[in-house]
Design a protein with these regions (language model features):
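Serine-dependent acyl-ester chemistry module
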Residues: 77-80, 88, 95-98, 111-130, ...
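Oxyanion-hole/transition-state-stabilizing segment in secreted/luminal serine hydrolases
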Residues: 40, 50-52, 74, 82, ...
Length: 404
């Protein structure tokens, strides 16, 4: 953090206890059974609902918790709720924001503001900080636990799009302000601006330099989920084919291990479904020692997921794909469908005809809006039925004609 930024923030009454660089190392937010996690913010939050990565990660990372999610993000919104005013005066947006959050019944709030506010530069920072504190004060009375997200860094695109360097300097200032507010109030802060980076110069995390694409939301979800109880749950299994027997197992249970000729079969029950990764999710490692020289194929519930020679199996092979990953994708698609229904539940199209000044023209359309509720409940029940892992049948077999 530069001295100028620090001086500006201190002048605004933002207090740092451990230094801004250490703020996102604060204690993680622990989820509880039955938590309702509500995402609140601007375009960064609203667009998350069409990808579903974060809530899928939190769901599969906590299979024993009955988590549910609501997205009340609103494009171009700010900490004052101005965009939510719609046809009313901008000042009325804050009251609507509070009602939308209250209607969602959160126990946990993940809040993402600041990206559009940063266009006001340093001059707009006092109003932003004051507005953010006012928002948190209004929400804190419910006893909800909160996590604050920074804005994301703008990507440099090809001309004629402008160089984002100056705006990224502004975003640095606003990120530091949010970090300071989180420190002051002992809230979890996740620094997406600093940590959300592409793996290579060719990779793009946005569609236009500003708004995250699928890869961007996947990686952002990983960063957030790692701080909210869904990180670091890789599984590993080591087997000695000579006995046969289990040498070690992490994050899973093994049963019915048998060896018949050149084939080893066993059942695996994971503690949680695999996590997403940028490489497609291959975070389970299987080591098998004592195999006769040759090539072996691994099938899970009859689906081929890996092939390697005996020396590679001895060293350890990363296993990805298969039924568990299909299960995760089903959960993600169900989350997206549920989000679609909830969006139209709390924010229906043709608002003036349903609740506004033209509602008398077409009768009582508002009575139909609660009909979204059973559709939402149906999707959540389907997610609940999939989030807990089931035992899988593994088969490691030597390929005919493999190396002798």
């Amino acid at each position: 953090m530069t001295r100028q930024i620090l001086f500006t923030l201190l002048a605004l009454g933002v207090v740092f206890g451990r230094g801004a660089d250490a703020l996102d190392a604060a204690d993680d937010l622990e989820l509880r059974d039955g938590d309702r996690i509500v995402l609140l913010g601007n375009t960064l939050i609203e667009r998350a609902q069409i990808y579903g990565y974060l809530e899928t990660m939190l769901t599969i990372g906590n299979p024993g918790l009955g988590l549910t999610f609501r997205n009340v993000g609103w494009s171009a919104d700010n900490v004052f709720g101005h965009s939510r005013a719609v046809f009313d005066a901008a000042a009325k947006g804050f009251g609507k924001l509070r009602k939308q959050v209250a209607d969602a019944k959160p126990t946990v709030l993940i809040i993402g503001y600041g990206s559009n506010a940063a266009y006001d530069g340093e001059a707009g920072l006092p109003a932003f900080v004051a507005g953010y504190k006012r928002l948190l004060d209004a929400l804190a009375g419910t006893g909800v636990r909160m996590a604050l997200l920074s804005p994301v860094r703008l990507e440099k695109m090809k001309p004629p799009l402008p160089d984002p360097a100056q705006q990224n300097e502004n975003l640095t200032l606003y990120t530091a302000a949010i970090a300071g507010i989180a420190e002051e109030r002992k809230l979890l802060f996740v620094d997406l601006f600093r940590h959300l980076r592409a793996d290579s110069p060719e990779e793009r995390l946005t569609s236009n330099g500003i708004h995250l694409n699928a890869s961007g939301y996947l990686k952002a979800g990983q960063l957030i989920a790692a701080r909210i109880g869904a990180g670091g749950k890789a599984a590993a299994l080591a087997i000695d084919a000579g006995k046969p027997g289990v040498v070690s197992a992490k994050g899973l249970q093994v049963d019915e291990l048998e060896k018949k000729g050149e084939t080893i079969t066993f059942k695996v029950l994971r503690g949680s479904l695999p996590s997403f990764s940028a490489a497609g999710g291959a975070e389970q490692v299987l080591q098998v020692a004592g195999l006769r020289s040759g090539e072996y194929v691994l099938r899970v519930d009859g689906v081929e997921v890996a092939k390697a020679d005996s020396s590679q199996w001895k060293a350890g092979v990363h296993v990805g794909g298969g039924p568990d990953y299909e299960r995760i994708e089903k959960i993600r698609k169900l989350a997206i469908e549920k989000n679609f229904f909830y969006f139209h539940r709390y924010r229906p199209a043709n608002w003036p005809y349903i609740y506004g000044f033209r509602r008398h023209e077409q009768g009582n359309n508002a009575v139909e809006i609660p009909l979204f509720d059973p559709l939402i409940a149906e999707k959540e029940a389907a997610i609940a039925s999939l989030r807990v892992p089931v035992a899988r049948a593994y088969e490691l077999a030597r390929v005919k004609g493999g190396a002798k």
